[in-house]
Amino acid sequence: MSRYRGPRLKKIRRLGALPGLTRKTPKSGSNLKKKFHSGKKEQYRIRLQEKQKLRFHYGLTERQLLRYVHIAGKAKRSTGQVLLQLLEMRLDNILFRLGMASTIPGARQLVNHRHILVNGRIVNIPSFRCKPRDIITTKDNQRSKGLVQNFIASSDPGKLPKHLTIDTLEYKGLVNKILDRKWVGLKINELLVVEY
């Protein structure tokens, strides 16, 4: 299955808030609840929804998610926690969390168009796994800095997670350490994703 390109609000209505997918929010109204099936949710449906939340938030394909679950399963720590750490340390997600892009698809586009440097080298792979002490900057040209400047100016510095720091004057971000579970920007039960 390829990456989702369809209407984003449909996914948000179904799964809840997905800040990585879009900034849009559905209108609050009682008619939203009536459209969907009511009654008892089955275990399969709950697990599927949690998996879909993860997929759409991080912009992953089914195959990519399975690969991350497989890598996390080999780790000695909790599989769900390792899975979230792997996803949060992706370059496109770190750009989104630093405030250099409004959404994860926007961050993917910045990386694909070669506007981003990691430790002084151009990286054009959005799934690049960042490590602690990696320095993420924009290219030293006006166009690259202009793209990131608007997003940094509009981002809230209070929402910046503890494992990242940003220098807004030089358009530079630093990965301090691997993320803790409590700083993940998505309400999700990762154990249900692993069980699925």
From Swiss-Prot:
Record keyword NAD present: no
PROSITE patterns the UniProt entry points to: RIBOSOMAL_S4, S4
Region (Disordered): 16-36
Compartments (UniProt record): Plastid, Chloroplast
Chief location category: plastid
A family per Pfam: Ribosomal_S4
GO molecular function terms noted in the UniProt entry: rRNA binding; structural constituent of ribosome
Descriptive protein name: Small ribosomal subunit protein uS4c
Gene field: rps4
Family: Belongs to the universal ribosomal protein uS4 family.
Keyword field contains RNA-binding: yes
S4 RNA-binding domain sequence ranges: 89-169
Subunit and interaction comment: Part of the 30S ribosomal subunit. Contacts protein S5. The interaction surface between S4 and S5 is involved in control of translational fidelity.
GO BP field: ribosomal small subunit biogenesis; translation
Function: One of the primary rRNA binding proteins, it binds directly to 16S rRNA where it nucleates assembly of the body of the 30S subunit.
GO cellular-component term (any): chloroplast
Organism listed in the record: Alopecurus pratensis
Keywords, alphabetical: Chloroplast, Plastid, Ribonucleoprotein, Ribosomal protein, RNA-binding, rRNA-binding
